[in-house]
Curated annotation (Swiss-Prot):
Keyword DNA damage: no
Region entry Disordered, spans: 746-824
General function of this protein: Component of the MIS complex, a complex that mediates N6-methyladenosine (m6A) methylation of meiotic mRNAs and is required for initiation of meiosis, progression through the meiotic divisions and sporulation. In the complex, performs a scaffolding role stabilizing the other complex members.
Phosphoserine: residues bearing it: 856, 898
Disrupted-gene phenotype: Severely decreases N6-methyladenosine (m6A) levels following meiotic induction. Abnormal cell cycle arrest in meiotic interphase before premeiotic DNA replication. Increases the rate of degradation of KAR4, MUM2 and IME4 protein. Increases RME1 protein levels, and decreases IME1 transcript levels. Decreases RNA level of genes involved in translation and ribosome biogenesis, and early meiotic genes. Partially suppressed by disruption of RME1.
Pfam short name (any one): Vir1p
Gene: VIR1
Annotated Polar residues bias: 746-784, 800-810
InterPro entries reported for this sequence: VIR1_yeast
RNA-binding among keywords: no
GO BP field: meiotic cell cycle; positive regulation of transcription by RNA polymerase II
Protein name, UniProt field: Protein virilizer
């Protein structure tokens, strides 16, 4: 067991099968090729045979067999003509057949012993393209994906079975890629050439294109199984990184060579001993598990700056998914981790999803603001040009004067615009994709600051990948993490392992329901975060398809809309399978907590509500089938359990909007007619009146909308210089300074001045720069404020907008995003959540001391009711009037605060 756990073999899942089985499978595939080549398309369907072929290829390992072993047998076989004829004659399913042909072509390409099927039939492709005028019919769409063969096969291998429904779901559109790229590459390929790379210049022209690198790997490198044919170490490392993504599709010898190259590229010059990074064993299971622990030890990392860590994580996940579960647990337990293996993987899933959501939201905000600036500049330029033409019609002198004046005004306007750009770029737009604040609190353990491990550093930083490549690697790691968690759940179910079983010595049965809820949240929180990411990718891709094309200057870190759509589908499908495996393992326990969790998150955000109902719809009506009959397994579980059934019915009844997505629940589960819903329109003020009075106090009606240009300008101009100085100062201070005046010694002469200045600003005014952090720890921008601007046109009740200051956002030394709630949707949430912007303290008593150290005005915002004025019983005069410049409103952090001591001192006073 120890040997298995410490050094699990670096092999693919298929190679664990005996060689006799592999030979038998290969002979069966060859017989299928003979049948496909001689088939009569009018009698038999070649498409059916092709689907069986590509599903068999998943179990055929990549071997080092020579091409000559099958040269004579495959020379005369034509397996593509029957399929091409079916694609031409098919009416509605032609795209599915083209995707099928492309996948079959890709599988043949990665097995070098089957290359004669392509090389001896190139004339067939040439004649077909000429007869069907494919030169003009397959022009490549600028926004489509140009797959490499390895990229395509790594996608389809995520699915247990390749079916027509899968191609209909993915809509890959591989016809253009097959005919214009892959076939053309093989037509230019010369297998007799010993060296296809004639210097750095030639390889540099195609090293950035994945489909070119994939073709080089499956042809030239497959013939040598060595990286020595490459002209320089730079290209060796670049192609090694590409090879590391596909352990099941590369010759094992070549894959091991690539992994060793990556491991040796660490900081070996810093160690010099036995523990230096060039001594890392790529087959050491403990090292790959340490990579997982490194990710959760540093949850605040910006993965765009951690190219090597993400690369090692990708390698580790590809390795771990092939290791037996008992070996994983045996070795992980010896590392002394405070987290279980399942907990570690779920935390990684959450961190990767959270990073991608926040990154996408930031890029979306920047793109929207850039478009706004471009539109504003165009309007200003048009106005200037129009004024110049009008003034120019008078005389030459006035024309010159007007031009100079307009240029000066334009320069001044540009200067003002640049000064305000950092301040209001986050005020004009609001992101739609918010992670509930309690997600992070419920899943991330408190982790003290820990230094990074040496193996995460890279001694050669000149070959860093670009941001788009790193983001794609993070997306791939996220999908692998979800697949690995699903695999563990399946193994736990097969082995009858129940982590919720308590030992006989544990008598805390009264807390059993709490443990169960925490266990379910361990899976459901990352699951819904990944589904939120999938929804974000889907929506962003649809925006581009509908004509909102992003201009060249805009930030786009994921790629075209096709790439976004594909990753969205992969993450959604993998998350759906994870949820299925969780329900299969835990039965009604998981189903009830899933419905309960969906009810909770739906009240937080309408996008999460949309995700929840789509997930439930797929689970109940489109997925798992019971083996005994055709009934849905989850449907049967729900009907047998009254708790789950009633929870589901309450949820559907609450959110039913009359749409088709709710109809199946009424028709197939509740056996009743779907109630007809009459839509109504409400203004924001009318909607707020439906809230309880204490919630209305927190969610006050804004005077203007946040998208108003005048509001933004007035907000910026009304902000005093003293207030800016205070905010810049507080980012470096340990004290929590609120809306206070600049440094004025607290004396009797200026006491009234201080109070009057505090009272000049209305309490309903919009806070311009009251927030010191751009990010929250779980959401891009905090959604809760007192008197903040509220965009009622796009957000539901409980989605609040708030203006932020960018110049102060990044001055903070705190690297963690602050944990703050993102929504206020229920009275209970409002009564336990403090708004970001405090209420200015007004001293109404002339005899009382105006220089009190008070707590945050909303410190006691946890009672059953909300006090609209500061509780004076908690104000304490410590006598420290000149600390931090004598600010009147700061937390007394200079000593430990005790409510009882403070009350006692006030009573004595």
């Amino acid at each position: 067991m120890q040997k298995c756990a410490g050094h699990a073999p670096l092999v693919t899942a298929a190679s664990r099968v005996s060689q006799d089985t592999v030979d038998a499978l290969l002979q069966a595939i060859l017989k299928a090729y003979h049948k496909l080549a001689s088939i009569d398309s009018h009698i038999n369907d070649p498409v059916e045979i092709a689907f069986k072929l590509i599903n068999s290829f998943k179990y055929l390992p990549i071997s080092g067999s020579s091409v000559k072993d099958f040269e004579s047998e495959l020379r005369e076989l034509d397996v593509f003509s029957p399929l091409l004829q079916s694609a031409v004659t098919a009416a509605n399913n032609s795209n599915i057949i083209w995707d099928l042909i492309a996948v079959l072509f890709a599988y043949i390409s990665i097995h070098k012993q089957l290359h004669p099927l392509i090389l001896h039939n190139l004339n067939i492709w040439k004649d077909f393209m000429a007869d069907n005028d494919e030169e003009t019919a397959t022009t490549t769409d600028g926004d489509s994906m140009n797959f490499g063969v390895l990229s395509l096969l790594s996608i389809v291998q995520n699915f247990e079975e390749i079916t027509p429904n899968l191609f209909e779901f993915l809509k890959l559109g591989l016809r253009s890629t097959l005919l214009k790229i892959w076939v053309a590459q093989w037509q230019r390929y010369d297998p007799s050439a010993t060296n296809l790379i004639n210097g750095d210049e030639k390889i540099s022209s195609w090293i950035t294109k994945d489909y070119q690198v994939d073709f080089f790997i499956i042809t030239s490198l497959a013939s040598t199984s060595s990286l020595e044919v490459l002209p320089s170490h730079y290209f060796v490392y670049k192609i090694s990184k590409r090879i590391s993504h596909f352990p099941n599709l590369i010759d094992p010898k070549l894959y091991r060579s690539a992994i060793s190259t990556i491991m040796e590229n660490g900081i070996s010059d810093n160690g010099g001993g036995e523990n230096s990074s060039d001594k890392i064993d790529p087959t050491d299971l403990s090292f790959h598990l340490q990579v997982l622990m490194e990710v959760i030890d540093h949850p605040e990392l910006n993965y765009l700056q951690e190219n090597r860590l993400i690369l090692l994580l990708d390698i580790a996940l590809n390795y771990l998914i092939l290791v037996p579960t008992h070996c994983l647990h045996s070795n992980f337990g010896e590392l002394g981790s405070t987290q279980s293996l399942a907990s570690t993987l779920n935390i990684i899933q959450f961190l990767l999803s959270k990073f991608l959501i926040n990154m996408g939201s930031i890029s979306q905000l920047i793109n929207q603001y850039n478009r706004k600036c471009i539109t504003t500049n165009n309007i200003n330029n048009n106005n200037i040009n129009n004024n110049g033409v009008i003034n120019g019609s008078t005389n030459t002198t006035s024309t010159t004067t007007t031009t100079i004046t307009n240029n000066n005004n334009n320069s001044n306007n540009s200067s003002i615009s640049n000064n305000n750009r950092k301040i209001d770029w986050t005020q004009s737009y609001q992101t739609r994709y918010q992670i509930p604040y309690w997600f992070e609190d419920s899943i991330l353990p408190p982790i003290p600051p820990i230094s990074k491990s040496l193996f995460t550093f890279d001694k050669n930083l000149d070959h860093e990948s670009d941001s788009i490549m790193i983001v794609n690697d993070v997306l791939r790691c996220l999908n692998l993490t979800i697949l690995l968690i699903s695999k563990l759940l399946r193994d736990y179910d097969d082995l009858k392992i129940n982590p919720l079983i308590q030992s006989s010595d544990d008598h805390s049965n009264e807390d059993n329901h709490v443990i169960i809820e925490q266990y379910m949240q361990l899976y459901l929180v990352p699951l819904f975060t990944s589904l939120l990411l999938a929804q974000q990718l889907k929506d962003r891709g649809q925006e581009r398809d509908e004509g909102h094309k992003e201009k060249e200057e805009n930030i786009n870190l994921i790629g075209s809309s096709s790439v976004k759509k594909l990753f969205s589908q992969l993450i959604f499908f993998s998350s759906l399978k994870l949820c299925e495996n969780l329900v299969i393992k835990e039965k009604n326990l998981a189903l009830y907590h899933l419905i309960k969790f969906a009810t909770k998150v739906s009240l937080d955000d309408l996008i999460l509500q949309k995700i929840s109902i789509n997930l439930l719809n797929h689970l109940f009506f489109h997925q798992i089938r019971d083996g005994s009959d055709d009934d849905n397994l989850i449907k049967k579980l729900c009907l047998k359990n009254q708790l789950s059934f009633q929870a589901l019915k309450d949820y559907i009844t609450l959110w039913n909007d009359g749409s088709e997505v709710y109809n199946a629940f009424y028709k197939e589960l509740f056996y009743e007619e779907q109630p007809k819903i009459k839509p109504i329109k409400l203004t924001t003020s009318d909607l707020l009146k439906l809230f309880p009075e204490d919630v209305q106090f927190v969610i006050s009606t804004p005077p203007n909308t946040i998208t108003s240009a005048s509001t933004s300008d007035n907000c910026t101009s009304s902000q005093s210089a003293a207030q800016k100085n205070i905010e810049n100062f507080t980012t470096l201070s340990k004290y929590d300074v609120y809306s206070s005046t600049s440094f004025i010694p607290s004396t009797s002469k200026n006491t009234n001045t201080n109070v009057s200045k505090q009272q000049q600003q209305p309490q309903n005014s919009t806070p311009c720069s009251s927030n010191r952090f751009l990010f929250n720890k779980s959401s891009l921008i905090s959604q809760e404020s007192n008197g903040s601007n509220n965009n009622s046109g796009t957000q539901g009740p409980g989605s609040m907008n708030e203006s932020y200051s960018l110049d102060n956002s990044f001055n903070t030394t705190n690297t963690n995003m602050t944990r703050q709630p993102t929504t206020l949707t229920r009275a209970t949430d409002a009564m336990t959540t403090a708004p970001t912007t405090p209420i200015p303290y007004k001293n109404t008593s002339g005899s009382s001391n105006n220089n009190l150290w008070i707590e945050s005005p909303m410190t006691n915002f946890k009672g059953s009711t909300i006090s609209k004025s500061t509780n004076k019983s908690k104000m304490v005069n410590t006598g420290k009037n000149y600390i931090l410049g004598g600010h009147n409103k700061v937390k007394n952090n200079s000593r430990a605060q005790s409510i009882h001591i403070d009350d006692f001192e006030n009573e004595n006073n």
